[in-house]
């Protein structure tokens, strides 16, 4: 009984202090350098569900899905112009069929929410959509196309995405384009460069991420934006994605503002 009372008081104190901490963080990032492009690795959904005591770990994916719309709104409120959200890797496609179907349904709901008029996002799907079931691919593409005239935050949705595969696809597309133009093999080799490959990435025409955030305590990129994140600042947090809060995001922005970006120099 004492433990319960102690926890309850602590919880009340935390809830009372939270708004003040959030306001303090907002003050600390006012007028300082902020990222234009933030990339998010939404990791830890299943672990969060297990540790929270849910028998059905898919509950973690559902709670995590609701967090994505919140995250996009946080970005809009802090003048982040572009967000890339990593939802499904090519490796994830090897999971059990029942779990995959559940993930496809959740991702479809997330994309539909982001495509809603209220959100006003401009969506871009990045990844191998041809690896997805036809109905899933159609649903995502229709949602993407419906946002063409929106004026809000740009949101890249990485689905069926693999960083190595993206680079391979970019090089192949470059070679195909040059071959179609009658370029010889020798001329083609001379035209392959960082800039020419960048123009054929899934994210072509967009700035590279300034800040990559990964939740759940894992400290690796796991194939996410391997080319684009070469000089990104990376911020890791032990917090699982479903438990990720606005103060966590603001802490990441504060940390970013304190770092000196050298771009390999």
From Swiss-Prot:
GO terms for molecular function: ditrans,polycis-polyprenyl diphosphate synthase [(2E,6E)-farnesyl diphosphate specific] activity; magnesium ion binding; Z-farnesyl diphosphate synthase activity. Its EC number is 2.5.1.-. Its cofactor is Mg(2+). Mg(2+) binds at residues 43, 233. GO terms for biological process: polyprenol biosynthetic process. Binds 2 magnesium ions per subunit. The active site is at residues 43, 92. Keywords: Magnesium, Metal-binding, Transferase. HAMAP family: ISPT. Homodimer. Belongs to the UPP synthase family. This is Isoprenyl transferase 1. It comes from Corynebacterium diphtheriae (strain ATCC 700971 / NCTC 13129 / Biotype gravis). The gene is uppS1.
